[in-house]
Amino acid sequence: MEELPATAIGLKVNDGIVLASERRLSYGGYVLSKQAKKVHKIGKFLMAGAGIYGDLQTLTRIMNVEIKYYEISTGKPISVHAAAKLLSVILYQYKVMPFISEILFGGVDEKGPQLYVLDPIGSLIEDNYAAVGSGARIAIGVLESEYDPNMNLDIAAQLITKAIKASIERDITSGDGIDLAIMDKKGNYENKFIPY
């Protein structure tokens, strides 16, 4: 499979999770938009991705509805793992005509911060940090050299920003600013935009 345009990065530390992506929306050598948000809050979860932008938007809408449906029908909140597994099943259902996307999905529950990586057909992998998209090869080197699960969320946000900036410098399909989503271990959420 060809690399999917964009760069998205996720990082799990003891204090929470951070997801980030750049904002460029491009196909081939053409930049369609410089304002494409690829990091979303879905209920109490965070999701970021690389790939076909319409597919990412559709998956975000589907997950919003499915999570609400689960919680209404069961009367209890869905766990991070169960929500990630739900996304995995949704992706697998479309394996013949897949969503062209690589997804980072995370959140915090009673088991602590969790980060999952999903491919277009629903493979589900839990990890401490991950990068997807065309800038992933560049970003992962930055993450591997400096990642520490004991770093605080501010340092984690700085590291993820550094990794995205490195990708923007070398990947033509990444650029136009950085969206950061931060969730601490209590579930508090913060969203930031960093011009770059």
Curated annotation (Swiss-Prot):
GO biological-process terms attached to the record: proteasomal protein catabolic process
Protein name (database record): Proteasome subunit beta 2
The organism of origin for this protein: Saccharolobus islandicus (strain L.S.2.15 / Lassen #1) (Sulfolobus islandicus)
Signal peptide coordinates: none
UniProt-annotated location(s): Cytoplasm
Activation/inhibition comment: The formation of the proteasomal ATPase PAN-20S proteasome complex, via the docking of the C-termini of PAN into the intersubunit pockets in the alpha-rings, triggers opening of the gate for substrate entry. Interconversion between the open-gate and close-gate conformations leads to a dynamic regulation of the 20S proteasome proteolysis activity.
InterPro entries: Ntn_hydrolases_N, Pept_T1A_Psome_bsu_arc, Pept_T1A_subB, Proteasome_bsu_CS, Proteasome_sua/b, Proteasome_suB-type
Proregion positions: 1-6
Subunit structure, interactors included: The 20S proteasome core is composed of 14 alpha and 14 beta subunits that assemble into four stacked heptameric rings, resulting in a barrel-shaped structure. The two inner rings, each composed of seven catalytic beta subunits, are sandwiched by two outer rings, each composed of seven alpha subunits. The catalytic chamber with the active sites is on the inside of the barrel. Has a gated structure, the ends of the cylinder being occluded by the N-termini of the alpha-subunits. Is capped at one or both ends by the proteasome regulatory ATPase, PAN.
Catalytic activity, as annotated: Cleavage of peptide bonds with very broad specificity
EC numbers on record: 3.4.25.1
Similarity-based family: Belongs to the peptidase T1B family.
Gene: psmB2
Stretches that traverse the bilayer: none
